[in-house]
C-alpha cells in the first residue's frame, strides 16, 4: 500500500492508510450515489438501497442484524451515543462500573454522568495491564445500570474477555447494560455479541477513511433508547443527520476485505511482534509493557533512557513512524501506563509500535536499527 519503500509506518493503532480498493469504492459512490437516501425519487431510492447493502455487510462482520447497526462519524461518537443514550433507558439505579483503562470517549462521558449524580466506579487493571474481572464484578449489584469495558486496549494491546465479563454481569443483574468499545478489536479478534448490549467500531482503524464508524445497539435496548441529540429521522431516529453514504460503503468494503484474511493476518502479526520482541532483548534497559495476552498488532515498551518525544523525533528523521501513547491523548502522559502503576520514567520513555497487514519484517528491522542508533547517539548527547 505504501508508495515510498523508505517509509516505515508502524502507528496503525492511531490510524491506518485507506486501502486503494476502499478509496475506489468511495470515489465511485461519490459519483454514482450522490442523492440523499431519504429522497423519494429514483436516485434517492438507489442511494437508500446502497446504504442498506452497506449496513448489511458491516452487520455480517459483527454477527448482528442489519437493523441493530447504526452508522456514526467515528468510534468516539459511537461511545458517546451508546453511553449517554443507554443510561437514560434505566431508572432502577445509578450504579456504573467501568475499567480503568478506557478511551477518553468513554472516560469523559462517564465523568459527566458522575457530575449528574451517577455513582461511577472505576476499577484499575492489574499491574500487568490485564482486566481485573473479579474486582469489576464485585461492584455489580441490583443498582448497577451500566458496565463498560474495552475489548482491546489502544495503548498496550490488552485483550479483555468481554464476552465472559458480559455473561457474568448478566448473571448478577440481567437488566445491567454492557457496553464494549471494540474500536481496536474489530477485524483483529473475533467478536461475539452474546450478552453485549452496545458496541462501538471505527473505520479508520481498518483501512477505511476517518469520519465513519458504527454502533451496534441490541434489539433489547432499541425501544427504550433515548439518544442524547435530536434532529432528523436518519438512522431510525437514533443518529440525526444525512448519512455519509460514500464512507458507509467504504466502511463496508474495508470490513468485508479484512474479514477474509483475519487468520492469515493474525499469523503474520504474531511473527512481526515476536521479531520485535526478540530484537528488543538486545537492550537491557527495555521493559515490555504489553501483557502476554495482548493482541500481536500492538507492542508497548519503555526504554527507560530517552524521553519518548526525543526518540520519536529521531525515528521520524528516518521516516520511521511510531507513537508514545494514544493519539487521542496528544501531549498527555499515558493514562493506561499510569493506571498500571508504571513509574514516571517508564511512562515518559514509552513507545508504542503497532502493525497492520501491510507491514513487513523489513519494517521491524528498520525500526530496530534506527532505535539502536538512537539509544547510542541520544544517550551520548544527554551525557
Positions of the model-derived regions?
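Pyridoxal 5′-phosphate
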Residues: 1-383
Amino acid at each position: 500500500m505504501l508508495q515510498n519503500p523508505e517509509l516505515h509506518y508502524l502507528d496503525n493503532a492511531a490510524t491506518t492508510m485507506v486501502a486503494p480498493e476502499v478509496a475506489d469504492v468511495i470515489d465511485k459512490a461519490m459519483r454514482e450515489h450522490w442523492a440523499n437516501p431519504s429522497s423519494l425519487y429514483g436516485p434517492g431510492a438507489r442511494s437508500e438501497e446502497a446504504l442498506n447493502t452497506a449496513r448489511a455487510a458491516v452487520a455480517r462482520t459483527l454477527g448482528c442484524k442489519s437493523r441493530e447497526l447504526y452508522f456514526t462519524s467515528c468510534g468516539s461518537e459511537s461511545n458517546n451515543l451508546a453511553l449517554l443514550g443507554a443510561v437514560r433507558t434505566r431508572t432502577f439505579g445509578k450504579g456504573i462500573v467501568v475499567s480503568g483503562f478506557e478511551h477518553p470517549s468513554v472516560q469523559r462521558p462517564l465523568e459527566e454522568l458522575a457530575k449528574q449524580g451517577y455513582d461511577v466506579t472505576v476499577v484499575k487493571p492489574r499491574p500487568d495491564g490485564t482486566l481485573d474481572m473479579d474486582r469489576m464484578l464485585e461492584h455489580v449489584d441490583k443498582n448497577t445500570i451500566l458496565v463498560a469495558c474495552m475489548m482491546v486496549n489502544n495503548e498496550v494491546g490488552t485483550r479483555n474477555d468481554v464476552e465472559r465479563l458480559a455473561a457474568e454481569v448478566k448473571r448478577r443483574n440481567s437488566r445491567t447494560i454492557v457496553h464494549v468499545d471494540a474500536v481496536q478489536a474489530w477485524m483483529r479478534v473475533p467478536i461475539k455479541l452474546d450478552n453485549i448490549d452496545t458496541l462501538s467500531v471505527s473505520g479508520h482503524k481498518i483501512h477505511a477513511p476517518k469520519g465513519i464508524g458504527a454502533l451496534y445497539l441490541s434489539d433489547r435496548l432499541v425501544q427504550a433508547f433515548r439518544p442524547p441529540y435530536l434532529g432528523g429521522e436518519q438512522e431510525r431516529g437514533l443518529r440525526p443527520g444525512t448519512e455519509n453514504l460514500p464512507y458507509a460503503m467504504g466502511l463496508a468494503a474495508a470490513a468485508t476485505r479484512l474479514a477474509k484474511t483475519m487468520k492469515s493476518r493474525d499469523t503474520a502479526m504474531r511473527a512481526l511482534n515476536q521479531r520485535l520482541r526478540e530484537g528488543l532483548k538486545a537492550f537491557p534497559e527495555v521493559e515490555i509493557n504489553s501483557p502476554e495476552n495482548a493482541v500481536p498488532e500492538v507492542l508497548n515498551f519503555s526504554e527507560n533512557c530517552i524521553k519518548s518525544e526525543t526518540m520519536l523525533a529521531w525515528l521520524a528523521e528516518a521516516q520511521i513512524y511510531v507513537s508514545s501513547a494514544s493519539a487521542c491523548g496528544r501531549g498527555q502522559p499515558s493514562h493506561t501506563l499510569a493506571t498500571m502503576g508504571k513509574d514516571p520514567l517508564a511512562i515518559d520513555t514509552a513507545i508504542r509500535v503497532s502493525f497492520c497487514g501491510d507491514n513487513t519484517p523489513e519494517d521491524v528491522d528498520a525500526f530496530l536499527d534506527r532505535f539502536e542508533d538512537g539509544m547510542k547517539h541520544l544517550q551520548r548527547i544527554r551525557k
